[in-house]
């Protein structure tokens, strides 16, 4: 009888273990992150909460740079916001797009040097933007990056999403949040 109960218990554990879902909606608590920089505000959909990496720092031109990021094994969200400073105006949208691409390519090293960016004009809540994509391969996997670049109320925004092609949850998350960016239209 004792063996029967153990076998039944083991069978139930195996059966119930197979009933679990590996869908991202069951694993992540999707939400929105509101980010304010200067007079500009964006709302970014994300699978998790993420925060500001540092207090406002400066880029190589002395312009204030605010960075927010979140990353786990399936997905990454990166937001940078650059403001103009005295003697260092913001780059144009096209220049800002190229700068964001160059920054990521440099971070990726050899894998980034071999990869090619594609880009297309898009609208983010009526604001002219550029959507850039890059697939960078390394160690038998491909990391997919999508970056949205736009300028709003004196702030150059670069919002980047990333996931591995070997992560089904990463792909599912990407379908839920990629490009879901609101540019608020508050007065003042």
List the model feature ranges, each with a label.
Residues 71-76, 127, 150-156:
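Short, solvent-exposed coil/turn segments at beta-strand boundaries
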Residues 64-71, 144-152:
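Short, surface-exposed beta-strand/loop micro-motifs that present aromatic residues
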Residues 55, 103-149:
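Signature of long, low-cysteine stretches enriched in small and polar/charged residues
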Residues 79-81, 155-163:
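Short, well-ordered beta-strand elements
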Residues 36-37, 71-72, 136-138:
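Short acidic, glycine-rich loop/turn motifs
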Residues 93-112, 177-182:
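Long, charged/polar, surface-exposed segments that mediate recognition or autoinhibition
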Residues 3-66, 141, 161-188:
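N-terminal targeting sequences that direct proteins away from the cytosol to non-cytosolic compartments
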Residues 67-98:
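A short acidic-to-branched-hydrophobic micro-motif
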């Amino acid at each position: 009888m004792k063996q029967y109960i153990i076998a039944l218990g083991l069978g139930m554990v195996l059966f119930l273990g197979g009933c679990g879902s590996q869908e991202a909606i069951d694993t992540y608590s999707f939400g929105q992150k509101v980010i304010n920089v200067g007079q500009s505000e964006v709302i970014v959909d994300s699978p998790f909460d993420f925060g500001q990496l540092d207090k406002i720092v400066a880029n190589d031109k002395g312009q204030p740079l605010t960075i927010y990021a979140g990353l786990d094994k399936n997905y990454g969200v990166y937001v940078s916001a650059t403001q103009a400073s005295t003697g260092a105006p913001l780059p144009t949208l096209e220049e800002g797009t190229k700068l964001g691409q160059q920054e990521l390519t440099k971070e990726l090293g050899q894998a980034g040097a071999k990869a090619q960016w594609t880009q297309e004009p898009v609208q983010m809540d009526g604001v002219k933007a550029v959507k850039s994509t890059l697939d960078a391969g390394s160690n038998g996997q491909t990391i997919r990056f999508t970056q949205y670049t736009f300028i709003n109320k004196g702030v150059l925004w670069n919002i980047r999403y990333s996931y591995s092609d070997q992560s089904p949850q990463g792909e599912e998350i990407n379908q839920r949040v990629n490009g879901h960016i609101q540019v608020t239209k508050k007065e003042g």
